[in-house]
């Protein structure tokens, strides 16, 4: 995927992962969190070293800026787990230290409140990466207050349109990247067209979209097994880039 995306997801932009259940979306997102933590720490250390050299040469403004940066620390990573499926043991297996990542698992909270909280967090300037897992788990107030069987029309789509329109410029201003995870739904009108929840806004505002699906099962040596294999060691994940606005769109399959 790093090769297909020309070095990873675009910074200070919106990226969307979508696809089948157990297709590798959340695992890939956690791996990105791990890489982001290391990158932010290296950038912080390099900036501190440069400012210390500048301050040592008598630059008073550099000394003040150095103190501000030391107070804030490196950019942070926030994982918003609306599905309450984040596994600390699994993330540790993937190489991520739980003490270096912020995990938010809100209870039954309105989608309006969660989206506003994300906007407020971006505006603090402290976050370098926010993962929203997942869009279909956002429940608008109008939907949460209705009984089962009562329908609401495009309430989440309307909320997301407003949200993405507001945060797309904030991400650039505060140097924060937003990674959203989405699911797919059966499309009764056209089974050959993939349908995702949340309306058109997640697709429109994303600079990068990647579609994940499960491939062949494999054994512990990485050899492909028949689809009927009962206890495979894992599965090959097929990822296809369906939108790319931050790099050449010539590497679509990973």
Residue ranges: model-predicted function:
Residues 76-79, 102-104, 129, 179, ...:
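Short hydrophobic alpha-helical runs that function as membrane-insertion/retention elements
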Residues 81-83, 134, 182:
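Glycine-rich, histidine-containing beta strand-loop boundary motifs that form or position
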Residues 1-100, 118-119, 123:
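The Walker A/P-loop phosphate-binding site
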Residues 85, 137, 186:
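Residues immediately C-terminal
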Residues 92, 142-144, 190-192:
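Short acidic, glycine/serine/threonine-rich loops at helix termini
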Residues 121, 153-254:
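Phosphate-binding/switch region of NTP-binding enzymes
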Residues 66-69, 106-176:
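Phosphate-binding/switch loop-helix module in NTP-utilizing enzymes
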Residues 38, 72-74, 94-101, 146-155, ...:
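A short alpha->loop->secondary-structure connector
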């Amino acid at each position: 995927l790093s090769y297909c995306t020309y070095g990873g997801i675009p910074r200070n932009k919106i990226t969307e992962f979508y696809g089948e259940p157990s297709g590798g979306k959340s695992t890939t997102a956690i791996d990105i969190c791990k890489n982001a933590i290391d990158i932010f720490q290296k950038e912080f250390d390099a900036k501190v070293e440069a400012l210390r050299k500048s301050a040592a040469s008598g630059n008073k403004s550099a000394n003040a800026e150095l103190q501000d940066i030391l107070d804030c620390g490196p950019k942070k990573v926030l994982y918003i787990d609306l599905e309450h499926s984040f596994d600390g043991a699994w993330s540790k297996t993937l190489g991520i230290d739980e003490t270096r990542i912020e995990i938010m698992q809100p209870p039954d909270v309105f989608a309006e409140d969660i989206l506003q909280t994300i906007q407020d967090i971006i505006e603090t300037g402290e976050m370098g990466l926010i993962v929203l897992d997942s869009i279909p788990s956002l429940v608008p107030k109008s939907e949460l207050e209705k009984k089962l069987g009562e329908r609401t029309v495009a309430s989440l789509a309307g909320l997301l349109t407003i949200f993405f329109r507001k945060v797309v410029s904030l991400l650039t201003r505060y140097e924060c990247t937003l990674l959203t995870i989405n699911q797919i739904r059966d499309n009764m009108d056209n089974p050959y067209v993939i349908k995702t929840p949340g309306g058109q806004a997640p697709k429109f505002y994303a600079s990068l979209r990647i579609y994940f699906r499960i491939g062949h099962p494999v054994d512990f040596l990485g050899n492909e097994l028949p689809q009927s294999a009962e206890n495979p060691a894992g599965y090959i994940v097929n990822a296809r880039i369906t939108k790319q606005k931050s790099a050449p769109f010539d590497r679509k399959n990973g």
